[in-house]
């Protein structure tokens, strides 16, 4: 049977066998078509008489009051100028072969309310359906099976959810909102750093958050990446292991690719009673210059009031993981942003008396927004991305900015130190920090000492390194909104949420050579990769009497997520380089193509991307298993 010329066919699964059927209006009847039109077993059908029917044939699921009732389809057509509907009785056409079905409905939260753009896959035995979600409910046939083995949703932001053993007739979303609603969790921020603390590898923070590639603040307005960072690791977080080494793990666990060009460990011995902080924060050019702040005397706020009218003084006295939240966070497509808010801080003038230098010491964490959030905010009146700004009162009593935005901590949880000597009045040290970011401060203090404490630095290079395939750490879910999401190194999740960017990555094994100098010959890491770094602690001098030891990890590189609105987000290429004007770089710029760089590509970038998520279609699943076995044999890894 052929489709008549000029017919406007409709496509759906009329008999719920999991195969798509095609049908169209014909003269004298309401329709004709082919069951399982794409298979060799396709069967011609005709159904129902509707004299005078004309126009395109449309198909919709019947919205039954009881979603657990019989699932059915109806056909819509025009008859004598009126819209009419009929339910094709395909049981008379395919007796005893009507399959089971599942009613699907999803709610998007991060991208759009209807979930338009998601990809839904259903696997039941040998039945496989792949649906590009159009934002309405769907009735999906699963053949003669009594349940679907797995239903998987890949949301527009790339997050994958799946539900196993779903019984026929079940109304997904109505029965299980935890599956049917798009999750709002962390998808991209930056790679993670863990250090050996004597008992386990402790999560330190996300790192290289100052280096996002292709991140727009608004359409056409890109964030310039700052490619290097010093990360503070306290002495109690990094201990010498049984082999006399300091060991850390650098991992990529989100939907990102990392390009790591340099690693060094700076060991800082400083006087007891002083604290050290790197001069780091997420800011716009000019970027903060490398510097180690020393702090020996601080002033705590005597009173803190939020824009919500609440007294938040106790929450900002010290770092105790209790954070003020004087705002209503924005959910959905504006995740990471909040309503305009401020914290007003008052300090005792006596605490600042005699201070020649006053520095803001602010510790906190930021719920990372992403490219889609920024673009959505830029196009929505009243929604703005406003970094923290220090405000003081002018002569008229109005609160006005005392300078450019301060920036914000580029990770969880980090401290930024900023000289505000000329920004606040010493006689009345009262100021506000205003923002629209979902930013949680753990403490806001003033350093009222000189930045001149002596310290001694010993730099260590990695004595060995190992790039390997690990998987994804189990998240430690927070029990409060103001708590950041941490990760447990000792546990890996059995359900990866995303695959690696397509492209070529650095081969597994030792990569010391690529981390020695900043030369654009870097390590390329994908989701699920880990880099183990060993430093020789026996090369360190003893800690001088009256001193204590902390560490600064120096990193140089970039990170790129796969948000749909991130520029050049879909693949590993194009590769970043230090001489680029921005990312994406201009048409007259290109990655260096010297003989040395060509040799680097040929020798090191030999590992194809890995698909962590097992495909549901039988053909792709077989291919995935073959690839996995091949990679396992090639890696020759064992015992991890």
Q: Model-predicted segments: where are they?
A:
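Surface-exposed loop/turn elements that mediate protein-protein interactions on large endomembrane-trafficking
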Residues: 1, 35-42
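Beta-propeller blade termini
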Residues: 5-16, 20, 41-84, 91-92, ...
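Structural motif
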Residues: 29-37, 87-93
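Serine-hydrolase catalytic core recognition
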Residues: 135-137, 506-541, 545-547, 552-559, ...
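Short beta-strand and adjacent turn/loop elements
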Residues: 360-368, 410-414, 437-439, 524-527, ...
């Amino acid at each position: 049977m052929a489709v008549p010329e000029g017919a406007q066919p409709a496509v759906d699964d009329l008999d719920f066998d999991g195969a798509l059927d095609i049908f169209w209006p014909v003269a004298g009847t309401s329709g004709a078509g082919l069951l399982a039109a794409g298979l060799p077993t396709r069967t011609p059908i005709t159904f129902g008489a509707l004299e005078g029917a004309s126009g395109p044939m449309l198909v919709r699921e019947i919205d039954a009051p009881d979603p657990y009732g019989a699932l059915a389809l109806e056909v819509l057509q025009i008859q004598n100028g009126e819209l009419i509907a009929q339910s094709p009785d395909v049981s008379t056409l395919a007796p005893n072969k009507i399959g089971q079905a599942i009613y699907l409905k999803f709610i998007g939260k991060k991208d759009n309310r209807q979930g338009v753009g998601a990809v839904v896959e259903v696997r039941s035995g040998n039945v496989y359906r792949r649906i590009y979600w159009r934002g309405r409910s769907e009735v999906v046939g699963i053949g003669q099976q009594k349940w679907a083995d797995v239903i998987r949703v890949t949301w527009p932001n790339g997050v994958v959810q799946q539900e196993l053993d779903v019984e026929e007739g079940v109304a997904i979303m109505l029965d299980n909102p935890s599956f049917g609603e798009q999750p709002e969790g962390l998808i991209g921020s930056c790679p993670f750093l863990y250090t050996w603390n004597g008992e386990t590898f402790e999560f330190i923070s996300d790192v290289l958050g100052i280096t996002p590639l292709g991140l727009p603040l608004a359409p056409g307005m890109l964030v310039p990446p700052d490619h290097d960072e010093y990360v503070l690791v306290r002495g109690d977080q990094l201990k010498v292991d049984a082999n006399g080494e300091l060991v850390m793990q650098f991992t990529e666990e989100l939907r990102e690719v990392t390009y790591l060009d340099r690693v060094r460990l700076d060991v800082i011995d400083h006087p007891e009673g002083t604290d050290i902080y790197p001069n780091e924060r997420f800011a716009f050019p000019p970027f903060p210059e490398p510097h180690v702040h020393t702090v020996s005397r601080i002033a705590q706020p005597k009173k803190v009031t939020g824009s919500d009218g609440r007294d938040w003084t106790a929450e900002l006295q010290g770092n105790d993981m209790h954070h003020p939240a004087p705002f209503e966070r924005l959910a959905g497509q504006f995740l990471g942003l909040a309503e305009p808010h401020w914290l007003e801080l008052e300090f005792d003038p006596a605490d600042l008396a005699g201070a020649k230098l006053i520095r803001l010491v602010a510790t906190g964490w930021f719920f990372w927004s992403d490219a889609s959030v920024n673009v959505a905010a830029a196009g929505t009146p009243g929604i703005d991305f406003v970094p923290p700004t220090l405000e003081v009162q002018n002569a008229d009593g109005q609160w006005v900015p005392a300078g450019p935005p301060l920036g914000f901590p580029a990770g969880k949880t980090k401290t930024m130190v900023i000289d505000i000597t000329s920004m606040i009045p010493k006689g009345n040290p009262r100021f506000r920090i205003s923002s629209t970011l979902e930013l949680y401060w753990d403490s806001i203090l003033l350093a009222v000492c000189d930045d001149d404490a002596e310290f001694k630095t010993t730099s260590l290079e990695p004595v060995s390194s190992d790039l390997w395939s690990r998987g994804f750490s189990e998240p430690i879910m927070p029990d409060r909104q103001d708590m950041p999401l941490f990760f447990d190194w000792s546990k890996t999740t059995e359900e990866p949420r995303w695959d690696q960017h397509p492209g070529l990555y650095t081969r597994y094994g030792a990569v010391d050579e690529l981390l020695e100098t900043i030369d654009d010959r870097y390590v390329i890491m994908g989701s699920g990769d880990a880099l183990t770094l060993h430093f020789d602690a026996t090369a360190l001098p003893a800690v001088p009497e009256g001193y204590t030891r902390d560490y600064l990890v120096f990193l140089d590189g970039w990170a790129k997520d796969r948000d749909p609105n991130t520029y050049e987000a879909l693949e590993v290429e194009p590769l970043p380089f230090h001489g680029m004007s921005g990312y994406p770089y201009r048409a007259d710029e290109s990655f260096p193509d010297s003989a040395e760089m060509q040799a680097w590509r040929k020798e090191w970038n030999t590992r194809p991307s890995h698909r962590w998520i097992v495909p549901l279609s039988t053909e792709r699943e077989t291919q995935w298993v073959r690839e996995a076995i091949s990679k396992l044999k090639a890696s020759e890894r064992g015992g991890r």
